[in-house]
Amino acid sequence: MYYQAISQCTQMLKNLESWLHKAEQHAGAKTFDVGVLITGRLAPDMKPFIYQVQSACDYVKAAAAWLSGQTPPKHEDNEQTIDEVRARIRKTVAFAESVTEAQYAGAAERKVSLSWAPGKVLGGEDYLLQMTIPNVYFHIVMAYAILRHNGVEIGKMDFLGPIHWIEA
């Protein structure tokens, strides 16, 4: 579970952070304020780019904390610039990567309660597989789609990030 919760999820956040540089390049080439992308959305009733980043970060830090027996750090949802978005991603990754594999011992059996489901809990493995991973990918995909919709030149390899090939 440690690999899926920490290594894979933090890599996706690092990929997302790398897209910010391309967003800045795109805005510079098209001569508009890159900050406009923070409020970008695909549909009028959809949450904006910044919400997608905040949510992905929140799911990663919650899984890192709850599945290792800790309380997640609180991050204010007040980012307004690309640099602040980048900082949010970096502090989330730093926290998640500070959790050791040893702290994840027993993670599958830990009980996770969610404020919107009073009186119910999820086992750690179900929480990771049914809540964390799908939500991290959902929000990162939405952030990707918003940037692409606004012309930022990112592609599938940017989404996938580094691939750890081994010799055949």
Model-derived features with residue positions:
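Short, contiguous alpha-helical
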Residues: 38-72, 121-158
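Generic recognition of short, well-ordered alpha-helical interface segments
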Residues: 11, 51-58, 84-87, 91
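A conserved active-site cap/scaffold subdomain adjacent to cofactor or substrate pockets
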Residues: 4-12
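Acidic interhelical loop/turn segments
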Residues: 28-39, 98-128, 160-162
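Helix-adjacent hinge/juxtasegments
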Residues: 61, 65-103
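Structural signal for well-ordered, non-membrane alpha-helices
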Residues: 13, 17-24, 61-64, 90-97, ...
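Short, highly charged C-terminal tails/helix-capping segments
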Residues: 156-167
